[in-house]
Each structure stands twice: as C-alpha cells, then as structure tokens.
C-alpha cells in the first residue's frame, strides 16, 4: 500500500510540472518571428489549444481576448473601445430616430379645410372651370387653350365675417389669384396680362359659387339651431327623454 501511494503521488507531481500545448491564455499572442513552435502565432502555425483554429485562446479565431474575432476589447469586432466596431460603427445604445407616424403624413387638403399660414382662410372644393366668353375670338380661344393653368379652387373665409356678397367675392378673388400666382411662379411659369385678366373673371365666378354654397350651409345651420332652441321643441325633447328614462 505504501509503495502504491508513493507511485501515485509521483505521477500527480509530474502531471503538474508537464507543460500544456496551448490552451487559454498560454503561449502569448506573438507575430511571426517571435513565437515558439507551439505558441499562438499569426499567421497560424499550429499548436493551439482547444477551440483555437489559428493558435489563439479559447474562442479566439485570430488571437485576442475572449469574444474578440480579430483582436480588441470585449465586444469589439475589429478592435477599438467597448462597444466600438473599429471606430466605424455607431456607439452602443444610440437612440434610433423616431419613425414618422402615418397618421401625421395622411390627409390632403379637403373642402373647407383651414389652410395654415393664411390667417384663417379655407380652401374650397375643386370646381369645373366655367365657360366664359370674353367678347372676341382671340381671347375665347386663348382661354380654352390655357384654362387648365388657372385655379379650380378658391380661398375664402366664413361668410359670417362679411357684411355682404361683394366683400366676400372681392377678398376671395384677391387671395386666390395671389396664392395661385406665387405658387405657379415658383415653378418657373409666368402669367401675362391676358392670363391675369382671364383668371380674374374665372375666379370671380368661382367665388360667387362658393359664396352661395357657404351662405346656404350657414343659414341651414342657423335654422337648425333656432328650431332646437325653441321652447316647444325643448319641451318635446324633455318629455321623450322622461319617457325613455322612466
């Protein structure tokens, strides 16, 4: 028994002193001409530890720290500081740009919609350009050939802000021609005196149509309010509510 114990103890001592061929963090990361025959050299010359395809530490494809594919700090794909991909990538946890909601992008200008930046003016619905005779063949033909260049919508304010139709139409014509001229001029198209003359006639007719439409809607709303605010109607509605609740 004593002899067996001594032999076992001697074998353990020899195992501890025996150098290991590679392994994690052994042999150093040497470049060509600086390594020993089994060290961690680059280019690879064999003799690496377990999991070392090219003579690096455990999990080191080309020699470097744990989790380093090409050498560098922890989490560095190509060298650099923590969370830096070789200085070419954005830093970790950089907040992404907020996505624009589709709700904020939707909605073209609708009839009666308030136009921003025009001081409370609204944009009317599209109309067919009226057929107008200007008294001579040249202008009539010119209008037919160029009517598509003129507005088919008008800008206006609510009718209750004007004392009469003439004031509404005058303001409507001025703001509509001004906006259309500025918008079209920025696109490189200019208007002649003939164009302005014809636009005034066309837009005037459209503003009159818009006034009649808005006036009718305004009076209908007023009539509805008067109807529902009259005492008999209020009494009838109250009685119906009492029957439903009771």
From Swiss-Prot:
InterPro entries: Prion (IPR000817), Prion/Doppel_b-ribbon_dom_sf (IPR036924), Prion/Doppel_prot_b-ribbon_dom (IPR022416), Prion_copper_b_octapeptide (IPR020949), Prion_N (IPR025860)
Regions that span the bilayer: none
Organism whose genome encodes this protein: Cercopithecus mona
Location in the cell: Cell membrane; Golgi apparatus
Glycosyltransferase in keyword set: no
Pathology linked to this chain's protein: PrP is found in high quantity in the brain of humans and animals infected with the degenerative neurological diseases kuru, Creutzfeldt-Jakob disease (CJD), Gerstmann-Straussler syndrome (GSS), scrapie, bovine spongiform encephalopathy (BSE), transmissible mink encephalopathy (TME), etc.
Gene name for this UniProt entry: PRNP
Binding site for Cu(2+) 1: 54-56
Signal peptide: 1-15
Residue sites binding Cu(2+) 3 per the record: 70-72
Biased composition (Basic residues): 91-102
Record's protein name: Major prion protein
Residues making up the propeptide: 224-246
Protein family according to the UniProt entry: Belongs to the prion family.
PANTHER family cross-referenced by the UniProt entry: DOPPEL PRION (PTHR15506), MAJOR PRION PROTEIN (PTHR15506:SF2)
């Amino acid at each position: 028994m004593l002899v067996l114990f001594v032999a076992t103890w001697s074998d353990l001592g020899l195992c501890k002193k025996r150098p290991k061929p590679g392994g994690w963090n052994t042999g150093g990361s040497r470049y060509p001409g600086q390594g020993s025959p089994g060290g961690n050299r680059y280019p690879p010359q064999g003799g690496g530890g377990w999991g070392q395809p090219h003579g690096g530490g455990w999990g080191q494809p080309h020699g470097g720290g744990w989790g380093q594919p090409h050498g560098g700090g922890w989490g560095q794909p190509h060298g650099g500081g923590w969370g830096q991909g070789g200085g070419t990538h954005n830093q970790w946890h950089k907040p992404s740009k907020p996505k624009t909601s589709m709700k904020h992008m939707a909605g073209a200008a609708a009839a009666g919609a308030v136009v921003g930046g025009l001081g409370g003016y609204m944009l009317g619905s599209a109309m067919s350009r009226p057929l107008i005779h200007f008294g001579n063949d040249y202008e009539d033909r010119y209008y037919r050939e160029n009517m598509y260049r003129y507005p088919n919508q008008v800008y206006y304010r609510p009718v209750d802000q004007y004392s009469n139709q003439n004031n509404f139409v005058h303001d409507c014509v001025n703001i509509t021609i001004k906006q259309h001229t500025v918008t079209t001029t920025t696109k490189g198209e200019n208007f002649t005196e003939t164009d302005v003359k014809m636009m005034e006639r066309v837009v005037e007719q459209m503003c009159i149509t818009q006034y009649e439409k808005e006036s009718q809607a305004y009076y209908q709303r007023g009539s509805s309010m008067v109807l529902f605010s009259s005492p008999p109607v209020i009494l009838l509605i109250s009685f119906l509510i009492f029957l439903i609740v009771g």
